Amino acid sequence: MHQKQTAQPKYHSGVVAVIGPPNAGKSTLLNRYLNQKIAIVTPLPQTTRNRIQGIITGDDYQIIMLDTPGLHKAKETINKEMVRIALESLGEADIALFLADASAMTIAPKKVERRRNEYQGYLEKVRCPTVLALNKIDLLEPEQLLPIIDWYSSIHPFTAIVPMSALEGEGTDILLKELVTRLPEGPQYYPDDIPTDSTERFIVSELIREKIFLRTQQEIPYSTAVLIDSFQENEKGPVVIHATILVERGSQKGIIIGKNGKMLGDIRKAAVRDVEKLLGCKARLQLWVKVKKNWTANEQILRELGL
């Protein structure tokens, strides 16, 4: 008699585009799934400017997760490019993951209600299954959750709704299963040990920009960009990185440098810690600050930044 062969588990793979309002926790979720920091996170909205691609690989699945800039009403050239990047990602997606901050409904319900038509407009553009992740439920009381689910259910027929907390990890395994079961059967596109297709140069520039966001106020974070001028790897010594921080005005340059260079020194030291963790080796980082008037409207610079 022939032994009955055990069927091999089907392999699922595809693209999940993560969209949603600014500061909802999209980058935090991606970093949690990858168990490492490839997307920067700050308390400020519109931190993410570029599309970040994370690769989440399991025994029988591979998710190519696109972390996109937050959807918002854009007026400036750079902001319009950010929204364009987010919406274009939907064209590549097998699944759209709409990530919303559930706690916003309890903190500023009128503000969320005013965005009803805006959210509906974005979601009407989606041509694939759409999963809703209600993030930050760790900030809610249990009785607050159901009305929030009802509100979001009224704006779009989501394929699934998953309450979760990207920061605490609650519900993230459930969300992952929901995504995997809806992915098509397909091949493994990337090796197991590849967490992203972003270059180390790009991630380093983002880590520096994150430190600027965390240490400056008002318009300063939104008026800065980071360009990596050189990235030199040495077999025996530290990686040597030279980077330029662009600002739009001379007054902003003074703020970033700080008294006796203290602010710039603090930014550099904090960035080096994360860069060394990323690269797994010692790093030496040199930073310069340069004024480039109206760079946020300069298409050549925006292209250089990948926007």
Task: Tell where the protein language model's regions lie, with residue ranges.
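Active-site glycine-centered loops adjacent to acidic/histidine catalytic or metal-binding residues
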Residues: D67, N135, S165
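Conserved G1/Walker A P-loop phosphate-binding module
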Residues: H2-G91, I95, A100
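P-loop NTP-binding site
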Residues: E200-L307
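Catalytic P-loop NTPase motifs of RecA-like helicase/translocase cores
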Residues: T48, H72-K73, T106, L140-E141, ...
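Conserved C-terminal guanine-recognition region of P-loop GTPase G domains, centered on the G4
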Residues: T57-Q62, E81-I161, Q232-E235
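Canonical P-loop GTPase G-domain recognition
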Residues: C128-P129, D138-T196, E200
